[in-house]
Protein backbone atom coordinates (compact mmCIF):
# COMPACT_ATOMS: atom_id res chain seq x y z
CA UNK A 1 0.00 0.00 0.00
CA UNK A 2 1.12 3.55 -0.68
CA UNK A 3 -1.53 5.29 1.42
CA UNK A 4 -0.61 7.59 4.27
CA UNK A 5 -1.87 8.19 7.79
CA UNK A 6 -4.47 5.41 7.90
CA UNK A 7 -5.51 3.82 11.20
CA UNK A 8 -6.80 0.25 10.86
CA UNK A 9 -7.75 -1.83 13.90
CA UNK A 10 -9.54 -5.19 13.73
CA UNK A 11 -9.60 -8.25 11.51
CA UNK A 12 -9.99 -7.22 7.84
CA UNK A 13 -10.38 -3.53 8.75
CA UNK A 14 -9.35 -1.48 5.72
CA UNK A 15 -8.11 -4.70 4.16
CA UNK A 16 -8.25 -3.53 0.50
CA UNK A 17 -6.84 0.00 0.94
CA UNK A 18 -4.03 0.62 -1.52
CA UNK A 19 -3.47 4.29 -2.30
CA UNK A 20 -5.89 5.92 0.14
CA UNK A 21 -5.11 8.45 2.85
CA UNK A 22 -6.44 9.63 6.22
CA UNK A 23 -8.88 6.76 6.85
CA UNK A 24 -9.84 5.29 10.20
CA UNK A 25 -11.35 1.80 10.32
CA UNK A 26 -12.00 0.09 13.65
CA UNK A 27 -13.89 -3.19 13.91
CA UNK A 28 -14.25 -6.43 12.02
CA UNK A 29 -14.24 -5.77 8.22
CA UNK A 30 -14.82 -2.04 8.70
CA UNK A 31 -14.04 -0.22 5.42
CA UNK A 32 -12.68 -3.53 4.11
CA UNK A 33 -13.59 -3.18 0.40
CA UNK A 34 -12.32 0.35 -0.24
CA UNK A 35 -9.17 0.70 -2.31
CA UNK A 36 -8.75 4.42 -3.03
CA UNK A 37 -11.31 6.38 -0.98
CA UNK A 38 -9.83 8.88 1.45
CA UNK A 39 -10.82 10.64 4.67
CA UNK A 40 -13.39 8.12 5.89
CA UNK A 41 -14.18 6.96 9.40
CA UNK A 42 -15.71 3.52 9.92
CA UNK A 43 -16.13 2.27 13.48
CA UNK A 44 -18.05 -0.92 14.21
CA UNK A 45 -18.71 -4.38 12.83
CA UNK A 46 -19.04 -4.15 9.00
CA UNK A 47 -19.21 -0.33 9.06
CA UNK A 48 -18.76 1.00 5.49
CA UNK A 49 -18.14 -2.61 4.46
CA UNK A 50 -18.67 -2.21 0.69
CA UNK A 51 -17.49 1.35 0.11
CA UNK A 52 -15.17 1.20 -2.87
CA UNK A 53 -13.81 4.21 -4.69
CA UNK A 54 -11.60 3.40 -7.64
CA UNK A 55 -10.68 6.96 -8.58
CA UNK A 56 -9.09 8.26 -5.41
CA UNK A 57 -12.16 10.23 -4.34
CA UNK A 58 -12.14 12.09 -1.06
CA UNK A 59 -15.46 10.86 0.25
CA UNK A 60 -15.69 12.15 3.83
CA UNK A 61 -18.04 9.37 4.99
CA UNK A 62 -18.44 8.67 8.70
CA UNK A 63 -20.13 5.49 9.91
CA UNK A 64 -20.16 4.58 13.59
CA UNK A 65 -22.14 1.55 14.76
CA UNK A 66 -22.61 -2.08 13.88
CA UNK A 67 -23.35 -2.28 10.13
CA UNK A 68 -23.70 1.49 9.79
CA UNK A 69 -23.39 2.36 6.10
CA UNK A 70 -22.70 -1.30 5.37
CA UNK A 71 -23.77 -1.22 1.69
CA UNK A 72 -22.56 2.28 0.83
CA UNK A 73 -20.40 1.97 -2.28
CA UNK A 74 -19.75 5.37 -3.85
CA UNK A 75 -21.79 7.88 -1.86
CA UNK A 76 -20.02 10.89 -0.36
CA UNK A 77 -20.47 13.25 2.61
CA UNK A 78 -22.64 10.87 4.68
CA UNK A 79 -22.76 10.77 8.48
CA UNK A 80 -24.26 7.55 9.85
CA UNK A 81 -24.26 6.93 13.59
CA UNK A 82 -26.04 4.00 15.25
CA UNK A 83 -26.58 0.32 14.62
CA UNK A 84 -27.87 -0.19 11.04
CA UNK A 85 -27.96 3.57 10.45
CA UNK A 86 -27.98 4.12 6.68
CA UNK A 87 -27.37 0.39 6.25
CA UNK A 88 -28.76 0.16 2.66
CA UNK A 89 -27.29 3.37 1.22
CA UNK A 90 -25.43 2.66 -2.00
CA UNK A 91 -24.80 5.75 -4.12
CA UNK A 92 -26.36 8.44 -1.93
CA UNK A 93 -24.79 11.72 -0.87
CA UNK A 94 -25.06 14.22 1.98
CA UNK A 95 -27.24 12.15 4.31
CA UNK A 96 -27.29 12.26 8.09
CA UNK A 97 -28.71 9.29 10.00
CA UNK A 98 -28.35 9.18 13.77
CA UNK A 99 -30.03 6.45 15.81
CA UNK A 100 -30.63 2.73 15.60
CA UNK A 101 -32.29 1.80 12.29
CA UNK A 102 -32.40 5.44 11.15
CA UNK A 103 -32.66 5.76 7.35
CA UNK A 104 -31.94 2.05 7.15
CA UNK A 105 -33.59 1.16 3.80
CA UNK A 106 -32.66 4.27 1.80
CA UNK A 107 -30.49 3.36 -1.18
CA UNK A 108 -30.26 6.39 -3.47
CA UNK A 109 -32.02 9.33 -1.81
CA UNK A 110 -29.73 12.22 -0.95
CA UNK A 111 -29.89 15.27 1.32
CA UNK A 112 -31.91 13.43 3.97
CA UNK A 113 -31.68 13.96 7.74
CA UNK A 114 -33.01 11.28 10.10
CA UNK A 115 -32.37 11.61 13.82
CA UNK A 116 -33.93 9.14 16.25
CA UNK A 117 -34.39 5.41 16.47
CA UNK A 118 -36.33 4.32 13.37
CA UNK A 119 -36.53 7.82 11.90
CA UNK A 120 -37.26 7.58 8.15
CA UNK A 121 -36.58 3.85 8.44
CA UNK A 122 -38.42 2.97 5.20
CA UNK A 123 -37.32 6.00 3.18
CA UNK A 124 -36.30 4.78 -0.26
CA UNK A 125 -36.42 6.55 -3.59
CA UNK A 126 -35.57 4.86 -6.87
CA UNK A 127 -33.35 7.58 -8.28
CA UNK A 128 -30.38 9.49 -6.97
CA UNK A 129 -32.51 12.53 -6.24
CA UNK A 130 -32.24 14.99 -3.39
CA UNK A 131 -35.39 14.46 -1.34
CA UNK A 132 -34.78 17.00 1.44
CA UNK A 133 -36.72 15.02 4.05
CA UNK A 134 -35.99 15.78 7.69
CA UNK A 135 -37.28 13.63 10.56
CA UNK A 136 -36.29 14.09 14.19
CA UNK A 137 -37.74 11.85 16.90
CA UNK A 138 -38.48 8.22 17.62
CA UNK A 139 -39.98 6.63 14.47
CA UNK A 140 -40.62 10.08 12.98
CA UNK A 141 -41.58 9.58 9.34
CA UNK A 142 -40.76 5.90 9.62
CA UNK A 143 -43.18 4.95 6.79
CA UNK A 144 -42.04 7.60 4.28
CA UNK A 145 -41.01 5.75 1.14
CA UNK A 146 -40.92 8.20 -1.76
CA UNK A 147 -42.34 11.35 -0.18
CA UNK A 148 -40.17 14.45 -0.50
CA UNK A 149 -39.54 17.72 1.32
CA UNK A 150 -41.21 16.69 4.58
CA UNK A 151 -40.17 18.16 7.93
CA UNK A 152 -41.27 15.93 10.82
CA UNK A 153 -40.22 16.70 14.38
CA UNK A 154 -41.44 14.75 17.42
CA UNK A 155 -41.92 11.14 18.43
CA UNK A 156 -44.04 9.39 15.77
CA UNK A 157 -44.53 12.68 13.91
CA UNK A 158 -45.78 11.95 10.40
CA UNK A 159 -45.29 8.25 11.03
CA UNK A 160 -47.96 7.19 8.47
CA UNK A 161 -46.77 9.35 5.56
CA UNK A 162 -45.68 7.18 2.63
CA UNK A 163 -45.67 9.23 -0.57
CA UNK A 164 -46.92 12.59 0.72
CA UNK A 165 -44.70 15.61 0.45
CA UNK A 166 -44.00 19.15 1.57
CA UNK A 167 -45.64 18.49 4.94
CA UNK A 168 -44.59 19.98 8.25
CA UNK A 169 -45.39 18.25 11.53
CA UNK A 170 -44.14 19.38 14.93
CA UNK A 171 -45.16 17.48 18.07
CA UNK A 172 -45.85 13.97 19.31
CA UNK A 173 -47.86 12.04 16.68
CA UNK A 174 -48.52 15.25 14.75
CA UNK A 175 -49.93 14.48 11.29
CA UNK A 176 -49.76 10.78 12.14
CA UNK A 177 -52.75 9.67 10.03
CA UNK A 178 -51.69 11.39 6.80
CA UNK A 179 -50.35 8.96 4.20
CA UNK A 180 -50.30 10.67 0.81
CA UNK A 181 -51.27 14.28 1.49
CA UNK A 182 -49.29 17.35 0.50
CA UNK A 183 -48.82 20.86 1.93
CA UNK A 184 -50.07 20.16 5.48
CA UNK A 185 -48.89 21.94 8.62
CA UNK A 186 -49.51 20.34 12.02
CA UNK A 187 -48.27 22.06 15.17
CA UNK A 188 -48.71 20.50 18.61
CA UNK A 189 -49.14 17.09 20.19
CA UNK A 190 -51.45 14.94 18.02
CA UNK A 191 -52.22 17.90 15.74
CA UNK A 192 -54.08 16.62 12.67
CA UNK A 193 -53.54 13.10 13.99
CA UNK A 194 -56.92 11.93 12.70
CA UNK A 195 -56.83 13.64 9.32
Question: PLM features: residue spans?
Answer:
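Glycine- and small/polar-enriched repetitive beta-structure motifs of secreted/surface proteins
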Residues: 1-195
Amino acid sequence: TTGAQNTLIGALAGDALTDADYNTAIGYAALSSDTLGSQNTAVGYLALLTQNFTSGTTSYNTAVGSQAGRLLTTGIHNTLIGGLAGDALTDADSNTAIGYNALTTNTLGSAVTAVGSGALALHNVTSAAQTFNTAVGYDAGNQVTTGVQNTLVGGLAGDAITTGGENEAFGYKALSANTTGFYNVALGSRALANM
